[in-house]
Amino acid sequence: MTRREMLTAFCKAGVPENAFWLGKITEAENVNGIAIEGNAWIVYYRSEGQLSNVYHCATQEEACDELFRRIMNVR
């Protein structure tokens, strides 16, 4: 799945495009986001503006699912 496909899937599910970031760690850790480090997909999740959880996932799909669940639980 490409970055554009992930963005499209999240937006179609009702998640605002400015609610998450997919890309570099420096940007992803400052918002709800997914970044790649080595072979790991890392999910950064913020609650009330504070970094509250970091999840290490084995696959892109797992990372997308985790971030999606976190964002949708907040809404």
Residue positions per predicted region:
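Short, exposed beta-strand "edge-strand" segments with a Pro/Gly-rich flavor and a Y/T-containing core
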Residues: 1, 52-58
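Generic structural signal for short, solvent-exposed loop/turn connectors between secondary structure elements
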Residues: 1, 74-75
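Negatively charged, low-complexity tracts enriched in Asp/Glu with abundant Ser/Thr
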Residues: 1-26
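A general marker of short, structured functional hotspots
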Residues: 6, 16-17, 40-41, 51, ...
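Short aromatic-glycine-(Arg/Gly/Cys) micro-motifs in beta-strand/loop hairpins
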Residues: 25-52, 70
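A short, charged, amphipathic alpha-helix used as a generic interaction element across diverse proteins
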Residues: 56-74
